[in-house]
């Protein structure tokens, strides 16, 4: 079970990195006037409160709210925000300081 979870996290990490590079490549191909569109701040789009940061490295990672955190990780509760309301943040026990 632990091996399967580690492999899943590895695959998702690779997919995330590939998705980020594809997004950058697509942005380079877009005309300049489409690149300059100003989007609302992430906090406003997702209803984040100003005191909370995003759930990302080095703080933790987002998982579906009913799924358990990986071994060694703990739920952050309301400490960090995920982009989807159906997700929760799993953090390192030391709050991201390893």
From Swiss-Prot:
The keyword Signal applies. Transmembrane segments: none annotated. It comes from the Eukaryota. Its main location: secreted. It is found in: Secreted; Nematocyst. Residues 20-45 form a propeptide. Residues 1-19 form the signal peptide. Keywords: Cleavage on pair of basic residues, Disulfide bond, Nematocyst, Neurotoxin, Secreted, Signal, Toxin. GO terms for cellular component: extracellular region; nematocyst. Contains 4 disulfide bonds. Belongs to the Cnidaria small cysteine-rich protein (SCRiP) family. delta subfamily. Induces neurotoxic symptoms on zebrafish. Has also been claimed to be implied in calcification, but this function seems improbable. This is Small cysteine-rich protein 2-like. It comes from Actinia tenebrosa (Australian red waratah sea anemone). The gene is Ate-SCRiP.
């Amino acid at each position: 079970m632990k091996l399967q979870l580690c492999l899943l996290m590895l695959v998702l990490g690779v997919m995330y990195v590939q998705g980020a590079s594809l997004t950058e490549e697509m942005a380079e191909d877009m005309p300049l006037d489409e690149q300059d569109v100003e989007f609302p701040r992430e906090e406003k789009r997702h209803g984040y409160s100003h005191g909370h940061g995003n759930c990302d490295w080095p703080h933790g990672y987002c998982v579906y709210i009913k799924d358990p955190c990986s071994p060694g990780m703990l739920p952050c509760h309301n400490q960090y925000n995920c982009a989807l309301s159906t997700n929760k943040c799993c953090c390192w026990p030391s709050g991201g300081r390893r």
